[in-house]
Amino acid sequence: TTDAYTNSKTNMSQLFGRSTIVDGKKTITGDSLFHNDKLKQNEGFGNVIYTDTENKNELRCDHLFYNETTGYGYATKRALMLDYSQKDTLYVQTDSVYRKVHAFNHVRAYRDDVQAVCDSLVFSSQDSCMTMYRDPIVWNFGRQLLGEVIHVYMNDSTVRKAEIVGQALSVEKCDEKNHFNQISSKRMDAFF
């Protein structure tokens, strides 16, 4: 950093100019960083990059807040999550993202084998389930899935199954020109 201020009485630091905070296998880089060692809080502004080399993921945004003690955190303004723990990187782009991964407004998730869009998304690492709300659409190898809510279950970052709830529709292009297979129901399970 080129400009920093530290208060040893309060254990608070402010770093200005392009700066980096390193904590074990995690780093936060940003144009301005604020660190409260007593409360174990970090906040970054401007082109923030949070990297966790142990879990092989990265978060990029313009505003980041993270509390190490509670695990609560959020990222706003052009948030982009990258999970490179598997051979194929998973990208999730959204306006805002929260620690349990709550992504809001204009969510896009993509990698080579699957793409998805929706208004809101919740990802739980406990059951490896990604739940998409409000006009969700999932594309996978020439197939399009639509519904009111879509639950995508993963196994080691590989899509295993999707549950489409409410006005479920699957559209798949046939080999022939302009012909499609279509299935519609109240609820549908799709296996990959």
Where are the predicted features?
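Structural signature for solvent-exposed beta-strand/loop edge elements and short helix-capping sites
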Residues: T1-F192
